[in-house]
A protein has these predicted regions:
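Acidic, low-complexity intrinsically disordered regions
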Residues: 8, 50-52, 58, 66, ...
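An N-terminal amphipathic alpha-helical segment
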Residues: 21-92
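Generic structural motif recognizing short loop/turn segments at the entrances and edges of beta-strands
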Residues: 61, 89-95, 127-133
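Amphipathic, interaction-prone secondary-structure segments
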Residues: 77-113
Length: 140
């Protein structure tokens, strides 16, 4: 078995920071220069890329961005403050979202899944019919 050295850990940290900086540059450039919806209201490849590369430190911003391009959000997007399962004295921001079967919203869900850290730390539940529940701690 290979022993993990201090130098190896430092190299991994540097590579991680470089990748993170490159992804932030891509997101910032796309947000500044590209259309997020096409002429029919579907999320563009640029929008899906932004969702899949969004930095994990900004969960609230991720949901704000996705909501801004979500089709039928008056019907399929609901936010609420709910008690946290544990500890009970804390609260979470809950996002109940439904795709309404619309392929544009389904493409956003797929882009969200590609952002594996964000998905793993916010996803709570999926149900048949395109219904999803996500939560973020209110202290984030």
């Amino acid at each position: 078995m290979t022993k993990v050295t201090k130098e190896m850990r430092e190299q991994w940290r540097i590579e991680y920071e470089q990748q993170k900086a490159a992804e932030k540059l891509i997101v910032d450039t796309l947000l500044a220069e590209e259309e997020m919806l096409d002429e029919d209201g579907y999320p563009t490849v640029a929008a899906q890329t932004v969702v899949s590369l969004w930095p994990w430190e900004d969960k609230k911003g991720w949901f704000l961005f996705i909501e801004s391009i979500w089709h039928l959000r008056s019907w399929g997007w609901h936010e609420s403050t709910e008690p946290k399962e544990y500890p009970k004295d804390k609260t979470v921001q809950r996002f109940d979202i439904s795709t309404a079967g619309w392929s544009g919203n389904e493409s956003l869900i797929h882009a969200m899944e590609k952002n594996s850290f964000m998905w793993a730390t916010t996803w709570v539940q999926s149900r048949r019919g395109g219904h999803y529940i996500f939560e973020i701690d209110n202290d984030e």
